[in-house]
Amino acid sequence: MADVRKMKETMIIIGSGAAGLSAALEFAKNGTRSILISDMPSERSQSVMAEGGINAAMDTQRDCPELHAEETMKAGRYIADSKAVHQMTEEAPKIIKDLFESGMAFTLNENKKPDVRAFGGQSVKRTFFAASNTGKQLMYVLIDQVRRYEAEGLIERLTGWEFLKLLCDEEQAYGCTLTHKVTQQEKILYGKVVIASGGLNGMFGNATGSVRNTGAVTA
């Protein structure tokens, strides 16, 4: 087994789309180093293809995070984790504000503020968007921020590596094994692991997203 690296204080993030980049940024802001693992560059992730928008209950149409959470749970047939959904809807307005202030090119209303539109499963307009390329604009902002922390050594991106398996004891994961797509070299990384590998498109015969999201990490 080649290149065994012990990084107990380093977070290992599997996936470098919007979720993976966001996780790395949060760790970096707190001074924690992270390594992003992906088999392709962030610029080619599934997140780039997202078109619809980002939901957040801002001060429009008497909306509120509680209503946002209620409608999100209903749209998901109440399968979702209620605590996680409520946390998401509480934090969503700040995320929109931060993205706008970071330069994300949202479609604007007549007051030069991010506009909202209707979307499925919602009784009010709460979807913030960037024309029909919301995902691409979001990734521009996240990648730009990640590069700044890369320069400081707080974020490292390992591209071209595929996840093989978690290393686990009886209670938790303590690392993972990777293989290089071209050379088949194997690498072991030690540290806490975050799974942000995206959806399961490749597991289905028909999917509207990229089949590069094979679902292999989840499987």
Question: Which role does the model predict for each range below?
Answer:
Residues 29-33, 42, 56, 208-215:
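A glycine- and small-aliphatic-rich helix-loop capping segment at beta-alpha/alpha-beta transitions
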Residues 39-174, 178-180, 196, 202:
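Conserved N-terminal/central alpha/beta ligand/cofactor-binding core
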